Amino acid sequence: LPQQVDHKTCKSNNMDTAIIEVRNLTLDDYNALKESMQKAYASLGGQYWKEETLKRLIQKFPDGQIVITHNGDVVGCALSIIVDYDKFGDKHTYLDITGNFSFDTHDPDGDTLYGIEVFVHPDYRGLRLARRLYDSRKLLCERMNLRMIIAGGRIPKYDMYANELTPRQYIDKVRNREILDPTLTFQLSNDFQVKKIMRNYLPEDNESRGHATLLVWHNVYYDSEKSIILRKKDIIRIGLVQWQMRPYFKP
C-alpha cells in the first residue's frame, strides 16, 4: 500500500514517540478490534461485533472499513456502507439501515456514505484519533464522489437530563455549549449538522434513551454528472496514512 507520512505533535499516553496509522480493516485485526470495542462500550455491557458479521461487511465494502493503530495496536475503527438515501429517508432505525446486519442495504451505486460504527479505545482518547478516522471517512466520500456522509449519532449524556429536557432542548444546549456531550460535541466540531432527531434508533441504548441524532456532512466536491461507471473504475483505497506523535505532558 502507498505510504504517506505526516509528522504531528500532540498528546501521547506514554513516554515513547507514538506511531499512528490509518488503514483498511482486515480480519486479522479482529481480536484486537474486539478488545478495543468492549472497552469503548463498557457502559453498554461491552458490546462487540461478531467476527462473521465483520467478515460479511468487509466482503461487501472493503474500502469503507477503516482502523487506526497506535504503535501497531488497533485502538479504533470507522465502519461504513453506501446507500441510496432516498430509499431510507429520515425515518429509519439502525437495524433498517444495516439490513439487520446482513448489509444487503449496501448499494455500490448509491449516493451516500452511511457511517454505521466509530469508536476509539478509552485509553487512547484525547489523541485526536477519532478526528483522523472522521477525516479518512470524509476523504473516502470525496474520492468516491458521494453526495454526503450520514450517520445516526448517540447522545450518551442525555439520560442525565431526560427528566428536565426534551431531546431537542438537549441538542440545542449541546450546540450552544451549555452541555458537553462527548459524542455530539465532537461531531458538531467536525462540521456535521443535526438534520433530525430519530426515536427508537437504538432502543437498547439506555444512555441516549433510544434516541439518535441524524447527522449529515455534505461533500462540497460532489459532481452529480460524474459517471458511476467511472467511479467504479477508480482505485479507492485508504492506503496507509502514518503520523509520528511526539509526547506532550502536563505537570
Task: Kindly give the residue locations of the regions a language model identified.
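Hydrophobic adenine-recognition pocket in adenosine-nucleotide-binding enzymes
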Residues: 25, 118-120
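Hydrophobic structural segments
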Residues: 229-251
